[in-house]
């Protein structure tokens, strides 16, 4: 039994009930009480609160041969939306998703050439996606930005060779966007976010390794149900591990880095050289 103040216990129980409805959708009040070990009175009170907040919907009765048919509860995944942004070297991509992570819209823009234009471009992108949320109860409830760099204690750092137009380490995007929209804004390494997404929506495992390969290479890890980033956030920065001593020259100044053999540009170059066709594209593979 959870001990503590009534408010804390209520909050924890409310969270547990909502999570169970999300994971077992649809579900009856009776089954919620049985699965969570809570009294029917507690379940009824919490469910009524969630119904009042429009986070849960009653969607009809369960089929049963005996007794009163239980009313089924379903998570209202359209009650709010989130925006996920991938801040790439040349393209900024955004996805608008409902509260279950199902995509409602995708958009992309060119990455601005000048850092001072980045905030304005992001605001324009976000505002262009707000229209689809007009009928939802809570609208946009959060924004997440994935970057191709390291995030540690909200501080952003990049490898020294990253081009200046993608360096947003001197822009306080979290503060700027939170002041504009009054909702939580998060910034994290894109591979870490991929790992979190895989763990949250698709995986039944407590340990996950998610490898992202594009112009660079990075690794996101969930270990024992927790995102693992290392002491300084560099745990997944594997692109500049030397795998071939005295190998190909890398933009970081070393030789034989993993990115020189497995990143998309390096794979395309190898493919172009092999088929004797300059500037091969991904579509050619």
Residue ranges of predicted features:
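Conserved phosphate-binding catalytic cores of ATP/NTP-utilizing and phosphoryl-transfer enzymes
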Residues: 58-80, 185-210
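Gly/Thr-rich phosphate-binding beta-strand-loop-beta motif of the actin/hexokinase/Hsp70
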Residues: 67-106, 210-223
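Extreme N-terminal segment that seeds HTH/winged-HTH DNA-binding domains in transcriptional regulators
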Residues: 1-34
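Glycine-rich phosphate-binding loop of actin/hexokinase-like ATP-binding domains
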Residues: 205-261
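Glycine-rich phosphate-binding loop and adjoining helix at the ATP-binding site
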Residues: 103, 107-123, 127-207
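A mobile "lid/hinge" subdomain adjacent to the ATP/sugar-phosphate binding pocket shared
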Residues: 256-285
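N-terminal helix-turn-helix
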Residues: 25-58
């Amino acid at each position: 039994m959870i001990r503590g103040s009534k408010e804390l216990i209520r909050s924890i129980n409310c969270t547990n009930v909502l999570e169970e409805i999300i994971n077992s959708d649809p579900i009856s009040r009776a089954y919620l009480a049985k699965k969570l070990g809570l009294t029917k009175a507690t379940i009824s009170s919490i469910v009524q609160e969630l119904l009042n907040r429009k986070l849960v919907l009653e969607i009809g009765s369960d089929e049963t041969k005996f007794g009163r048919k239980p009313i089924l509860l379903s998570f209202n995944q359209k009650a709010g939306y989130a925006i996920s942004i991938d801040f790439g070297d040349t393209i900024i991509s955004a996805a608008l998703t409902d509260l279950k992570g199902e995509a409602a819209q995708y958009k992309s823009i060119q990455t601005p050439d000048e850092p001072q234009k980045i905030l304005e471009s992001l605001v324009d992108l976000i505002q262009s996606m707000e229209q689809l949320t007009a009928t939802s109860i809570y609208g946009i409830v959060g924004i997440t930005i994935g970057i191709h760099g390291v995030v540690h204690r909200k501080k952003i750092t990049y490898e020294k060779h990253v081009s200046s137009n993608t360096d947003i380490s001197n822009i306080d995007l979290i503060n700027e966007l939170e002041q504009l929209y009054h909702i939580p804004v998060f910034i994290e390494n894109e591979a870490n976010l991929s790992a979190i997404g895989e763990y949250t929506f698709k995986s039944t495992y407590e340990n996950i390794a998610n490898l992202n390969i594009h112009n660079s290479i990075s690794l996101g890890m969930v270990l024992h149900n927790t995102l693992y980033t290392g002491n300084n956030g560099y745990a997944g920065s594997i692109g500049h591990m030397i795998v071939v001593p005295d190998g190909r020259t890398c933009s970081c100044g070393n030789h034989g880095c993993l990115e020189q053999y497995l990143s998309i540009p390096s794979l395309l170059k190898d493919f172009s050289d092999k088929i004797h066709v300059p500037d091969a594209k991904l579509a050619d593979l």
